[in-house]
Amino acid sequence: MTLDAVGLEVMGHAFASVAEEMGLVLVHSALSPNIRERRDASAALFDADGEMIAQAAHIPVHLGALADAVAAVRKEDPRPGDLFLLNDPYAGGSHLPDLTLIGAIEVDGAVGGYSVVRAHHSDVGGMTPGSMPAGARELYAEGIVIPPVRWTPEVERLLLANVRTPGMRRGDLAAQRAAAMRGAEGVRALASRHGWPALREAARDLLDYAERRTRAVLSRLSTGGGTPLAAMDYLEGDGVSDSDLGIKVRITIADGTFHADFTGTSEAARGNVNCPLAVTRSAVLFVVRTLLPDDVPTNGGVQRALRITAPAGCLVNAERPSAVAAGNVETSQRIADTVFRALADGGLAVPAQGQGTMNNVTFGGPGWTYYETIGGGQGASRGAAGPSAVHVGMSNTRNTPIEVLELEHPLRVRTYALRRGSGGVGEWAGGDGVVREFEVLAPMEATLLTERRRHGPEGAGGGSAGAPGANLVNGAALGAKVTLPLAVGDVVRIETPGGGGWGKRQL
């Protein structure tokens, strides 16, 4: 069957509704504030060939990388009804705290597709609470590494024996299993209503439709046979050294294909800012998705139009055993910024840079861990000021409510406010960042993984840059990426970057 326009809309929303229900089951069942309140989790459906059919509107850095996880599971000869667990960044994962559950959906006695749930767990072992140590030089220092394995109670016992908060992890994993089961139930319900052959063909039609729409847009943006669009941007150190690390990209858009070539990017770092290729692909996919009309379904058809080149062993195509905790959350942001910069230099209308960081904050002590990311300023665009205090780019989480944070952890929030005046000046101003100040109520260890502390987000069209962020403890400035002990009474202050302004300010 070939769906008409109405059929594409109906079936596209039917699949997407199942993915959204998976997400709701997860966040309403999870124990940890990071998943329950911040919603640092994602859900999607894949067909039996490993292409994404539909996703919920969750976390870009998760969603674009899930295809690699499904591909890794398919190599394990999944049987109908099997449930797989993984977090290995070099076998389909992103970074170790992101535990992924993949259910092989049984339809008529065969594997009809996959329900996929990825969620950030606030501890998976390793050398520091939160499993994101700033000074890690190997993957193994960041936590337990799980290749694609069938989930069994014994596998769960092994995992829980290697984490600091086993009760919380057990509850969050149960929520993920429930979400994966809801996905399978939803697909079987659609198959019962429409018939399995028709449903399978509808999924193919949706993939082909998204590919056609994507390639049509890219054909209008073609760079032809001319010089590729090029840009370079930098990371502010790797947690071991403060030296800048370069990310270089050349973009060619031709024959309906978007080719991002990262040749010339820095070699893999000693610290934890390295990216597995799946995360790099996710960042490029995010950029391409912003170029498409809203009604184009975000599925594997869009990914068909992408091509990524990255030398093995470089910063954005790291190899085992490079540490990757910050690569997923910080380097992914810079990859997206760099690709956007190349497009802007080529004359494409893109906004000024947003904060370009997730401002990762991890606290932990005996029997507890806490993780959050903090919003900042978005860049302005031609005709609109940038929003303030929002998550930008590869993140899409909420800020943790103060009441929840203080109720469940030995922390007191002294300040939570807009960082007035931090947005870049222009005809349209960049959004303001955030000030978030924590008072320590018990001895603990903290890790900060942040960016844009030296180089503020750039403006566009003559607008000025947003203010760089700052990390302080008791008023003393810290680096962008640090792990340190904290005593009772210490005050940790995070000032997040403002977004860049757009256009010259009219006097």
Regions found by a protein language model. Name each.
Residues M1-P80, L86-V107, V111-H259, T263-L507:
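Glycine/proline-enriched, intrinsically flexible loops and inter-domain linkers
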